């Protein structure tokens, strides 16, 4: 099945973060099953971030596609480069953002799956 008309959402100050989060959904919401909450490319312009938040009832896996991410994993900060993958299990906390002085947009692939 080919998906050519992808839905784009823009979330402002998501989870108390700064700026806009552009979410380019890979598949139509109607086709998402009981296991998947979201599968999308997430784009953050310089200075934009998703605020620190907890996953409850689901987990998230993120792959850095391009740019450099500032990632907070339960209070431990790290830098993600293209190809790096992080996972936030159910009940854990995280945030991710693009540095204010970044020279390019941050592109991520995000998969949020419901917990069993």
Which residues does each PLM region occupy?
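Short acidic-glycine-tyrosine-enriched beta hairpin
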Residues: 75-90
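A short, N-terminal "cap"/entry segment at the start of jelly-roll beta-barrel domains
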Residues: 1-36
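Conserved short histidine dyad/triad with adjacent acidic residue
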Residues: 25-27, 40-56
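Conserved hydrophobic/aromatic beta-strand scaffold that supports enzyme active sites
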Residues: 23, 39-43, 61, 85-87, ...
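A short hydrophobic beta-strand segment most commonly corresponding to one strand
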Residues: 87, 102-116
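A generic "binding-loop/recognition-motif" signal
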Residues: 46, 57, 76, 92-93
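Short beta-strand His + acidic residue motifs that chelate non-heme Fe in jelly-roll/DSBH
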Residues: 52, 71-72, 88, 94-102
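Glycine- and acidic-residue-biased ligand/ion/polar-headgroup-sensing regions
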Residues: 57-69
């Amino acid at each position: 099945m080919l998906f050519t008309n992808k839905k784009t959402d823009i979330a402002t100050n998501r989870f108390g973060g700064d700026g806009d989060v552009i979410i380019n959904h890979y598949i139509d919401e109607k086709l998402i099953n009981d296991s998947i909450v979201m599968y999308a490319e997430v784009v953050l312009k310089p200075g934009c971030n998703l605020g620190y938040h907890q996953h409850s009832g689901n987990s998230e896996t993120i792959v850095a596609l391009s740019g450099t991410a500032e990632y907070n994993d339960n209070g431990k900060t790290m830098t993600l480069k293209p190809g790096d993958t992080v996972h936030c299990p159910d009940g854990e906390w995280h945030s991710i953002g693009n540095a204010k002085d970044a020279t390019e947009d941050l592109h991520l692939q995000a998969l949020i799956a419901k917990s069993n």
